[in-house]
Each structure stands twice: as C-alpha cells, then as structure tokens.
C-alpha cells in the first residue's frame, strides 16, 4: 500500500507541477504587462510635461530675443531659428506620440499611408533643423571670439545659412515618402507594423544619420575646441607677439566676454543633453537596421520615444537660465509688467460708483492729490493757540446751528442751513465748490466745515489773520495765489565787461538812468 501510494504520488503530483508552472508563467506575464502599462503611463505623463514646457520655453526665448538686444543680430537669428524648430517639433511630433504611447491602436487614421508619410516627413524636417542649428551657432561663436572687432558673418550671410539649414532638412527628409518604416529622433513610430529591412532603407538611414546628426554634432565640438584653444594664454601670447612684429598688418586678438562665455556653456550643454538623450534612439536604430532584430523590448521602444524629446525642453531652459544677461532682461521685463498691472489695479476705471471703504488714493483715481494732502498736513501743523481758537470757533458754530434748527417750524421739512465758512477760507478765491451738502460731524479734522477740498485751497499760514504766526513759510507777498503769482521779482542789474587796449578786463556797473 505504501508502494502504491508512493507510485501514485508522483503521477498525481506531475499535473500539479505543470499547472503550477503554467500559473507561474501567467503571473510573470501579467507582472510584465502591468510593468509595461505603468511605464507606458509614465511615458505619457513625461511627454505631456515636455510638450507644455517646450512650447512655453521656446515662446519665451522668441519673446526675449525679439524684445531685448542682448546678442548680436546674427546670433539672435540663429537662436530664433532654433526656437522655431523646437516649437514646430513639439507641435508635430509630441502629440501623436502621446496618443500612440497611451494606446497603440486607438487612432486608426494615423496608420493611413498618406497621413503617416506626411507626418514622418514633417518629423524629419523639424528634427533636422534643430540639429543643424547647433553648428550654425557654434560657427558664429567661433568668428565672434577669434575676430571680435570684425563682422565675418553679415546679416545676408546669416539669412543664407538659415535657408541652407531648411533646404538641407527638406532634402534629407524627402526619401521618407519612398521608405515607409522610417524612425526619427523625436518620433519613433513607423508607418507599418511589420518592420521590413532592405538595402535602400539601410543606405538611407546611414546617410541621414551621418550627414544630419553625426557630422553637425562633431562640427560643434570642433568649433568649441578651437575656441578654447584660441582663448588659452599661450595662444594669446603668440598672437600678441605676431602683432608686435608686423605692426602694419591688422591682427585680431581673441577675446570672449562673460556673455559670450555663458553662450558657449549654453551651446555645450544643449549638445551634451541632445547626445545623452539620443542614446536609446541610436540603440533602437542599430537593433532594427543593422542587427535586423524586429522584436525589440517594449521598454526600449518607450524610452526611445520619450527620452530624446527631453532636449526640446532642455534647450530653452538652458538658454534662459545659464545666460545672466537674458535672465536679467527677462526678470526686469516681468517686474515692469507686474508694476504696470498693479498700477492698473490701483487706478479704478470704468465704474462711477466709489466705495467708501477704499483709501483716498483709490477714490481719487490718482495718488498725487493724496500726496499733496499728506504734505499739507505734515508741513502746516497748527500750533496750540491756533487749535484753541479753532475749537472755540467750532463750538460757536455748533451753537448757532442748534438755534437755527430749534427755531424752524415742525410741519415744514428741515433744510440744511448753509454753513459759515471758517476763517481759513474767507479770503480764498479758488475754493472748490461743494458737490453735496456735508454735515459738520462727518469730518472731525481741521477742514471739517469746508464744503470741498482741492489742491488750490489756501492753508491758514497764507491768510491775513495768521500773518504774524511763527510757522509762516512764505513772506507776506499777498493773500491769494493770484497775488503771489503776480508779484514781480526785482531784476538784478547786469554788469558790463569791457576790454581795454592792454587786454585787461574792466568791470563797469550799469547805472540806471
């Protein structure tokens, strides 16, 4: 029985082992699918961030180069070209790759042959323009350092160079219409699901990557090395000695300012980020084209989709952060916009109703009147005697107002008696007329019984009653602003100078006849 039991046990345990192996395989496959799905979601999120940041950053670069004159016109043209190509690549490449990364079979119309070829052509063009803009900027930097007092690249030559960049990109991208399964740096989706390898496709991939990617990047590093060598101390010494030996020839001494050094660092950082982010793309091209491996890893494919697009975001970020002059201009412009916006908020426009809770500067619509009012209060502070006299006068006027109110009949409507102006406004000719009758108890300050306030009212120190006050600030030239303005300052007699025969200056005072 034990033998039978031992014999049955392996027979019964074998199906259990096979079912366990199948369950383990299913669980591992499910784990891989879940990891791939999580990585796909991460890829989609990163591409959305790159899309928004690239558009905002490149538009900011365009705005800063158009608004400020930090760099020369030739350098600005190349930077604008790089920013425009980044915007176009972000608009054309990123959205469709986001859709394909989310769900590869969601949009069937993307896989139509005509639409796919046109889309891949635009991908190639904008990617090529972005890469070819790097050596153009490096060439401009090389000439500006080696010949700081000369202009080797004129505006016409820079326009021709930009036209060549776009023509090169278009010519290098035209074969996409003949080859369907072509992947580029910023978009790795293909027009056919089955990868077909051919000799023509291999030749095109090699020629394109050598002429449009590898050679331009090598030229950038070559120019940067030449710039570094020209700025070295030994090379400068040789140039100075040669200039001293041949003074009749004009020899330029290499020079790089702080601004140009920052631009060199920006260019080097851009190219370095581009190379590092393009490593997954290069690996994918080698796998599919050279090694002819059709079934590549999903993780490699997704990494080759999102990682090269980081350079679209890194280019404007590096340009706006590394260059101190650009950063200062950008911050200054933002501060000016903030001041202008806050000033517009302070000055209320469009509504005629004024809230009583607002400050006087907001009620008036301008801060000048409030500043004038504060200045008057600080300069013309009443003395103790003046405060006592004003208090007595206010008490007498309150008593008179009460008598008028008690003497009026009860059946009639009570009308507000015209307030007697204080002594401070008796001689004023330019007093502001009241808009509405004001009760004396609303304004408890020294101007309580004045019906209006304006910048042309006379302070108490200008009036005849307070002429002998110690706090007078003006001489007694008149009582009103008109009299003060009409007073004439005595003319100072001019002194005549005459030259004698001995070249001596004689000064004769002019006598009024």
From Swiss-Prot:
Annotated Pfam families: 7tm_1
Sequence ranges on the Extracellular membrane side: 1-41, 99-108, 178-204, 286-301
InterPro entries: GPCR_176_Rhodpsn_7TM (IPR043523), GPCR_Rhodpsn (IPR000276), GPCR_Rhodpsn_7TM (IPR017452)
Keywords recorded for this protein, A-Z: Biological rhythms, Cell membrane, G-protein coupled receptor, Glycoprotein, Membrane, Receptor, Transducer, Transmembrane, Transmembrane helix
Tissue: Expressed in brain, lung, heart, stomach, intestine, cultured aortic smooth muscle cells and cardiac myocytes.
Membrane disposition: Multi-pass membrane protein
Region Disordered: start-end pairs: 1-25, 404-432
Glycosylated sites: 4, 11, 17, 26
Topological domains, Cytoplasmic: 65-77, 130-157, 226-264, 323-513
Gene Ontology CC terms: plasma membrane
Alphabetized Gene3D superfamilies for the sequence: Rhodopsin 7-helix transmembrane proteins (1.20.1070.10)
Highest taxon of source: Eukaryota
Biological process according to GO: adenylate cyclase-inhibiting G protein-coupled receptor signaling pathway; circadian behavior; G protein-coupled receptor signaling pathway
Subcellular location: Cell membrane
Role played: Orphan receptor involved in normal circadian rhythm behavior. Acts through the G-protein subclass G(z)-alpha and has an agonist-independent basal activity to repress cAMP production.
Family the UniProt entry places it in: Belongs to the G-protein coupled receptor 1 family.
Protein name: Probable G-protein coupled receptor 176
Gene that this sequence comes from: Gpr176
